[in-house]
């Protein structure tokens, strides 16, 4: 793609997200979401491959449907209540419709079916943008409208997403489809705690972005698209294979890695709020996700591809454009757990 065109599209991505962040009026927020969607479509379709075009079409249709639902809900609220402010969403029909529309935009269960199919047709770098940056604007709106939404609906969507995010990845062999179930499960944890501790939701979102970026970048450096090709990683780059396994375990929420922090704090907060059953169900669904992360780790580190070469394995990475962000995100994805006391004091949990 022409660098000037790419610069304009990436600037539009940033503009759309910032516009939604800064909006207090539904129409401006909707415009920001639409700028975001229209800016990423050429980036998704730049490969000129039938799978990429199919993924782009599916993404456009789902995002257009969600945007139409948001516009319908905000117009209905303005008609019934007389308010266009995001914080003044009060009618039950409008709140439920907006919640379902935002769930569709984010890929939360039970309206998640488009996400694995879309990510399967994309390159890993574009998939990273879709899994991180494109989640920010809808999630900002969800945080703003969360106080007006029925808590039972939020908890149900959260638990269903954690279950689907773990269950859906069990029978997958394509890494991009497995990575698609990753945001479904993690965003489910965030929605679960959204009404009780918004600051904890923001912490979880930040760590999710760091860990997801690290996972996508390591797999892109490994040039792996299926579980079988992961077995060749150890002979190509042992250091990167070990780091990838640790990042995946962090995503699964195992101590002493960074991914354990948000799960631990969320379970603690749910118990404080008198929801031990929800906390237990969320912890049990996390085991499903952990199982397929362990499958990937097994393929990465315990399965060595038949190799008759006598050449020594390269332990040092070649310096490329993604080496620095890969290093930073990997360090943060692995070593932030000791900061938990400072984080809890800062968030006053």
Curated annotation (Swiss-Prot):
It comes from the Eukaryota. Keywords: Electron transport, Membrane, Mitochondrion, Mitochondrion inner membrane, NAD, Respiratory chain, Translocase, Transmembrane, Transmembrane helix, Transport, Ubiquinone. GO terms for biological process: mitochondrial electron transport, NADH to ubiquinone. The keyword Translocase applies. InterPro entries: Complex_I_Subunit_2 (IPR050175), NADH_DH_su2_C (IPR010933), NADH_UbQ_OxRdtase_chain2 (IPR003917), ND/Mrp_TM (IPR001750). It catalyses: a ubiquinone + NADH + 5 H(+)(in) = a ubiquinol + NAD(+) + 4 H(+)(out). It is found in: Mitochondrion inner membrane. The chain crosses the membrane at residues 3-23, 66-86, 98-118, 139-159, 178-198, 199-219, 240-260, 274-294, 319-339. It is a multi-pass membrane protein. It is an enzyme of class 7 (translocase). Its EC number is 7.1.1.2. GO terms for molecular function: NADH dehydrogenase (ubiquinone) activity. Its main location: mitochondrion. GO terms for cellular component: mitochondrial inner membrane. Belongs to the complex I subunit 2 family. PANTHER family: NADH-UBIQUINONE OXIDOREDUCTASE CHAIN 2 (PTHR46552:SF1). Core subunit of the mitochondrial membrane respiratory chain NADH dehydrogenase (Complex I) that is believed to belong to the minimal assembly required for catalysis. Complex I functions in the transfer of electrons from NADH to the respiratory chain. The immediate electron acceptor for the enzyme is believed to be ubiquinone. This is NADH-ubiquinone oxidoreductase chain 2.
